[in-house]
Design a protein with these regions (language model features):
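Nucleic acid-binding interface residues in structured DNA/RNA-binding domains
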Residues: 1-112
Length: 112
């Protein structure tokens, strides 16, 4: 069943509200954000972040394995250091990833 434009807009607002609620030093994956909103649409979360995430803490939403958003690794690293987000050095890619097991945010209340 296709979503209406209004439903897509509501989903985008829900994504951004949830991302805004992630505390400094913590992260979620695209899949986590989708699941917390009752969806399996992790790619749709990525689309929302790409199109509308600039004014939101976009660096707190990661690819699987704790990898920062593609193309934004250096800018994300600055935020991670400023927020004391736990990082792990890697020999490949951008040279680091977020220690997802430690930094993953588990909200005490489900999103509304």
């Amino acid at each position: 069943m296709a979503r209406s434009a209004g439903a897509g807009h509501e989903f985008a607002l829900d994504v951004l509200d949830l991302v805004d609620s992630i505390p400094p030093g913590h992260v979620l994956s695209y899949g986590d954000v989708a699941a917390m909103l009752g969806s399996r649409a992790s790619r749709a979360v990525g689309t929302v972040m790409r199109q509308s995430g600039a004014g939101h803490p976009w660096w707190r939403v990661l690819r699987s394995g704790g990898h920062p958003p593609t193309g934004h690794e250096a800018r994300a690293h600055e935020h991670y250091v400023a927020e004391s987000t736990p990082l792990v050095r890697t020999a490949t890619g951008c040279g680091y990833r977020v220690d997802y097991a430690v930094a993953r945010w588990i909200p005490t209340e489900p999103p509304t």
